[in-house]
UniProtKB/Swiss-Prot annotation:
Disulphide connectivity of cysteines: 64-70
Chain's role: Antimicrobial activity against the Gram-negative bacterium E.coli, the Gram-positive bacterium S.aureus and the yeast C.albicans.
Propeptide part(s) removed at maturation, as residue ranges: 23-44
Protein known as: Brevinin-1PLc
GO biological process, one term: defense response to bacterium
Signal peptide feature range: 1-22
Species this chain originates from: Lithobates palustris (Pickerel frog)
Keywords of this entry: Amphibian defense peptide, Antibiotic, Antimicrobial, Cleavage on pair of basic residues, Disulfide bond, Fungicide, Secreted, Signal
Taxonomic lineage of the native organism: Eukaryota, Metazoa, Chordata, Craniata, Vertebrata
Tissue: Expressed by the skin glands.
Pfam families documented for this protein: Antimicrobial_1, FSAP_sig_propep
Amino acid sequence: MFTLKKSMLLLFFLGTINLSLCEEERNAEEERRDEPDEMDVEVEKRFLPVIAGVAAKFLPKIFCAITKKC
């Protein structure tokens, strides 16, 4: 009876370790999937001020040309 309990405990322990390793791999895969999204946000942050600067330069000229009130 003792050997049966010992082997069952060993199987439970190994199964628990295997399950935790699978969860770690799953978390690592999710982190890898998140990286491109973070890179997209960084790219947006870099280009947004440039676009705003260009718009600030040309909007008054365009508004002046449309309304002809310069």
